[in-house]
Amino acid sequence: MVTINQLVRKSRSNKIIKTNVPALSSCPQKRGVCIRVYTTTPKKPNSALRKVCRVRLTNGFEVTSYIGGEGHNLQEHSSVLIRGGRVKDLPGVRYHIVRGALDCAGVKNRKKARSKYGVKKIKNK
């Protein structure tokens, strides 16, 4: 137990909470421009060609973000919206691209979990 005198000499310090998404600077999403769109391979037990892109954000940060879903229309100089959320098997990828926002189109022929991939509801007649 700390005494009052000890508290007078040195007050209690608050715990520093480290953010997992520093480039967003306390915003839910940030806009950026694609610098490079490429594929990369995941860590050991998994095998695939994951679609990622290097994005320069409006606040000057440059981050690698993951392009979710099957197929995409992104290329260099595309304007994209990124959100937080890491990809467990890709080291250094801590952001996701929001599908269906700005220049990034939604996933074609998507019927389930549409909101995650920027797809509008189909009108049945």
Swiss-Prot record:
Location of 3-methylthioaspartic acid modifications: 89
SUPFAM superfamilies in alphabetical order: Nucleic acid-binding proteins
Keywords annotated in UniProt: Methylation, Ribonucleoprotein, Ribosomal protein, RNA-binding, rRNA-binding, tRNA-binding
Any one Pfam family match given in the protein's UniProt record, by short name: Ribosom_S12_S23
GO molecular function: rRNA binding; structural constituent of ribosome; tRNA binding
Cellular component terms (Gene Ontology): small ribosomal subunit
PROSITE patterns reported for this sequence: RIBOSOMAL_S12 (PS00055)
GO biological process: translation
Superkingdom per UniProt: Bacteria
Classification via NCBIfam families: rpsL_bact
Quaternary data: Part of the 30S ribosomal subunit. Contacts proteins S8 and S17. May interact with IF1 in the 30S initiation complex.
Role this protein plays: With S4 and S5 plays an important role in translational accuracy. Interacts with and stabilizes bases of the 16S rRNA that are involved in tRNA selection in the A site and with the mRNA backbone. Located at the interface of the 30S and 50S subunits, it traverses the body of the 30S subunit contacting proteins on the other side and probably holding the rRNA structure together. The combined cluster of proteins S8, S12 and S17 appears to hold together the shoulder and platform of the 30S subunit.
Family recorded in the similarity comment: Belongs to the universal ribosomal protein uS12 family.
Listed PANTHER family: 30S RIBOSOMAL PROTEIN S12 FAMILY MEMBER (PTHR11652)
Entry protein name: Small ribosomal subunit protein uS12
Organism: Wigglesworthia glossinidia brevipalpis
Gene: rpsL
